[in-house]
């Protein structure tokens, strides 16, 4: 299953980008052995619209263009369901085992995600109830993708 990340906003060169890239590289190397591969990282500029609702709508259009037809859509949202690492790995494994070809994990902009996306989403999850800056969210989800691969493959990286 090909996994893509979609993010509103661009990571500037620096330690955050380096750390996210390190975990995505680990995921890209370990994932194919268990049927998971990194397909793409799509970054789009934040909308310049004058109000939040318009910005969210414009960003949702960009997400829909980047998301493969028939693919699984997971939204990251502070109001989403909190999963531990094992449950996140199980969710990815379930989608993979159902024969799903593409999965996109979406990180919204400062205004959040457009309400229309929630109806289309296959899952809405959170990385805790706190609000995180998008730079840190990318690091956290990149690490959790790598951790999910290690859980699904029985690698000792994940210890409880």
Curated annotation (Swiss-Prot):
Leader peptide range in chain numbering: none
Binding site for S-adenosyl-L-methionine: 76, 108, 127-132
Record keywords, A-Z: Cytoplasm, Methyltransferase, rRNA processing, S-adenosyl-L-methionine, Transferase
Gene3D superfamilies xrefs: 3.40.1280.10
Pfam families assigned to the protein according to its UniProt record, in alphabetical order: SPOUT_MTase
Location relative to the cell: Cytoplasm
Superkingdom to which the source organism belongs: Bacteria
GO molecular function ontology, one term from the record: rRNA (pseudouridine-N3-)-methyltransferase activity
Gene Ontology cellular component list: cytoplasm
Keyword Transcription: no
UniProt record similarity statement: Belongs to the RNA methyltransferase RlmH family.
Quaternary structure, from the entry: Homodimer.
Name of the protein in its database record: Ribosomal RNA large subunit methyltransferase H
Organism: Rhizobium rhizogenes (strain K84 / ATCC BAA-868)
């Amino acid at each position: 299953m090909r996994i893509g990340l979609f993010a509103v906003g661009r990571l500037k060169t620096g330690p955050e980008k380096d750390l996210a890239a390190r975990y995505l590289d680990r995921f890209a190397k370990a994932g194919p052995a268990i049927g998971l591969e990194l397909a793409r990282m799509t970054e789009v500029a934040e909308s310049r619209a004058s109000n939040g609702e318009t910005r969210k709508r414009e960003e949702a259009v960009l997400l829909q263009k980047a998301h493969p037809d028939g693919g699984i859509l997971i939204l990251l949202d502070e109001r989403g369901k909190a999963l531990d690492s094992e449950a996140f790995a199980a969710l990815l494994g379930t989608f993979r085992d159902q024969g799903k070809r593409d999965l996109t994990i979406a990180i919204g902009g400062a205004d959040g995600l457009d309400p229309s996306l929630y109806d289309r989403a296959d899952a809405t999850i959170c990385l805790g109830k706190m609000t995180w800056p998008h730079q840190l969210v990318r690091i956290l989800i990149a690490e959790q993708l790598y951790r999910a691969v290690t859980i699904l493959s029985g690698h000792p990286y994940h210890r409880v």
